[in-house]
């Protein structure tokens, strides 16, 4: 019975991978990483603050990473996610994907709400959403923060994308 169950589960996952898509309830793991059916998925075309990165609001340090993760939790709680893979998994097994929830782009919503920034080196799809969030001073844009890519460079942190 266990073998049958495992075989069925592997067949379902293989079908999803072959179709370049993964579906199911999502859980926020980090500010731009979700987990679906045990598979970690990095959101394509966007970037966000990192651990040890300070943000300020009204001259005081605030927990911007926790706020970004919480916003992603709110978004993924709205329904199951469908993610279209954008290449092979990285060295940690994470997929890079465009995801939707209720037919809305999760990637774009996180940027539009100001808790992620566009990553134009991957796609320009989210540049307008970032500009709108910045202009409206929502999310991270309410205060000051270093762009995540610049923070990683300054801190000597290398994050490989698939």
Map each language-model feature to its residues.
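Small beta-barrel nucleic-acid-binding modules, primarily SNase/OB-fold domains
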Residues: 5, 16-162
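Sec-dependent signal peptide recognition
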Residues: 1-8
């Amino acid at each position: 019975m266990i073998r049958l169950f495992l075989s069925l589960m592997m067949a379902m996952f293989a079908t999803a991978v072959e179709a370049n898509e993964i579906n199911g309830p999502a859980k926020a793991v980090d500010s731009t990483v979700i987990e679906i059916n045990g598979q970690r998925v990095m959101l394509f075309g966007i970037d966000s603050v990192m651990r040890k990165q300070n943000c300020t609001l009204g001259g005081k340090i605030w927990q911007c990473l926790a706020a970004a993760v919480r916003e992603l939790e709110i978004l993924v709680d709205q329904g199951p996610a469908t993610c279209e893979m954008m290449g092979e998994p990285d060295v940690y097994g994470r997929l890079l994907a465009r995801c939707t929830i209720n037919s809305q782009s999760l990637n774009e919503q996180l940027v539009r709400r100001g808790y992620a920034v566009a990553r134009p080196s991957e796609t320009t799809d989210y540049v307008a959403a970032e500009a709108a969030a910045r202009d409206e001073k929502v999310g991270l844009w309410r205060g000051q923060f270093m762009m995540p890519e610049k923070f990683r460079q300054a801190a000597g942190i290398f994050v490989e994308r698939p």
